[in-house]
Amino acid sequence: MIELHSSPTPNGQKVMIMLEETGLEWKHFDVNIRLGEQFTPEYLKLSPNNKIPAIVDTDGPGGGPYRMMESGAILFYLAEKTGKFLPKDARKRYDTMQWLIFQMAHIGPMFGQANHFNNYAKDNIQYAKDRYNNESIRLYRVLDNQLSTNAWIAGDEYTIADMAIYPWTKGHKDRGIDKAGYPNFMRWFEAMQARPAVQRNNKMADEIRARMAKAAEGKTPIDMFNTQDNAARLSRATGH
C-alpha cells in the first residue's frame, strides 16, 4: 500500500498519475496547504521540508514501511519498485532522467513563479511578471522542439518524464499556447489527456479540491507566501 500525503497541485498530481498508471494499491491523505497542515509535526516526519507530496510505502525496501519526500524522487522510486515507465535501456533511461530533472529544475520553478506573480503577489511587479511569463513561454518552445522528433517527452516511450511535465502544462492556454504555434506540444498534450490514468487523475484532483474546500469552511487560511511566517511555523513545529 502506498500512502500519498498530498494536495492536488501539479507536484501532487504527477504522483497520482504514476500510481494510477502502475495499478499499485494506494490511498490519498489530504494535506491542506492553505490551512498550514504541511507544518504539523506529524507531516514534518514525512517531509522535513514542509512540502507536498510525501509517500509512505508500507511494503518498502526490506519489507518495512519507507517514507519519501520530493515528487521527482517519488516517481523514480515507484518506477524502480514496479519496473514500469523507466526504460531498462541505458540511453533511454538517461534520456528519461534528463527530462525528469528538466521539469524539476526549470518547468516547476519557472511556471510556479509565473503563477505566483500573476495571481498571488501582493504587489504588481511587472518585471517579475515579464521575466517568469517569458521564461515559461520559452520552456514551452523547448518542449515543442523536443516533441517535433519524439512521440513522448523522452523519446518513443511513455515515461515518468511525461507524467512529471503534464500537470504543470494544464494552464498552457493562459500563456497563449495553441496548435498554431506549438503543434507538437499540443499533439502530446492531447495524447496525455486521452490516457485513462490521466483522466482518472483529473477527476480525482477535482474531487480532492472540493473535499478540502468543504473541510476548510469556517477556518482561517494561512498566507502560504509569507516566507518569514513559514520559517516561524517550521521552527515552532520542530522546536528549533
Regions from the language model: what does each represent?
Residues 79, 168-169, 202:
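Active-site-flanking alpha-helical
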Residues 205-240:
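Acidic/histidine-enriched, glycine/proline-rich intrinsically disordered or flexible terminal extensions
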Residues 52, 146-153:
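Cytochrome P450 catalytic-domain "roof"
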Residues 106, 110-115, 153-181, 186-194, ...:
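GST superfamily/GST-like fold recognition
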Residues 55, 74, 143, 162, ...:
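Residue-level signal for nonpolar/aromatic packing positions in well-ordered secondary structure
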Residues 135-138, 142-146, 191:
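Solvent-exposed, charged/polar functional surfaces in cytosolic regulatory/catalytic domains
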Residues 86-88, 110-113, 151-156, 199-203:
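Short, hydrophobic secondary-structure boundary micro-motifs
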